Structure formats: C-alpha cells, structure tokens
Amino acid sequence: MFEIELKNSDEMVIRAKDNNVSINVVQSTINADLKVGMIRGAGEFEIGDIAIIAKSLKGGGVMYRIDVEGIKIGIVGSTAVIEDLDELGPIDILGCSDAKYVPVVEPKIVIPMVNMDFAEIKASVKNEKKLKIKNANSLPAVMEIWNLD
C-alpha cells in the first residue's frame, strides 16, 4: 500500500512502505531526504522500493515515470509535447498540468496539478486530501479524477 498527496499544486508526494519521495514538476526536482540532497534533471533512480525514470523534455523540463508496487505513475508538466508522452509507456496514475495529456495516456486515475482545468475531462471527480492505493486490483475500472487539495 502507498499514498499520494500534493504538497502544493506543483509537488506530488508519494509515501511508500519505507520511503517518501517528493517530485516537483515545475522545478524538475526529486526530494527523498537523501544524503546527496535534492536530485535535479533526468536520470534513473531507485529510492528504496520506488523506481523513478526522469526524462528530459524537448520543450525543457522533465517528466517522470515512477513504479511503486507494480503501479505506474506518470508526472508531466506543461512543457511536454504529445510526442514526449510515448516515452512514458503505460501509466496507471497520471499527475499532469494540462488536460490534453489525458486522452493520450489513458490513465485509470488523473491527479490535476499546477491548477489544471479538468472540467473538459469526462470522468467522476473525487475531492480528497490523499489517494491511498492498496494494490493494482484496487485501481478503478473506469477513469477517475482525484482532485487532491
């Protein structure tokens, strides 16, 4: 089981068994309270049981693919172009700043970030403080929007 919440509109926090990882989509940083400090930019990282692939975007910035307990999480900021999204692969949960990414990625859960206008997305909306994921079987069959505030 793990939890996802937003620290603010541009920073997602993932709380797994033994690790907490905070990813800021605007600043392109990963913070996991590591001795080396904050991680900036692209690369592949394993922080305990959380695997992260950070890919540079053509328009600047970084997008993230995070694997936690077999569930794939994508985090995409406003500098991504549609062609960039192919590099994410299949995604279960998408945190993004633009609704145009949603039909391309087709996640089971969308988490609006950076004040994304999600009114045009046809899906049920849940307003909660955090999202708790037990396992892959607990993901919804039909896409949902989780507005974490």
Where are these regions (language model features)?
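Proline-aspartate-enriched helix->loop->beta-strand connector
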Residues: P90-D117
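Short, aromatic/basic amphipathic alpha-helical patches
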Residues: F118-K129
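Short amphipathic alpha-helical segments and helix-helix/interface helices
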Residues: M63, L85-L88, A99-P103, K122
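Core dinuclear metal-dependent hydrolase active-site scaffold
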Residues: M1-G89, I93, E128-D149
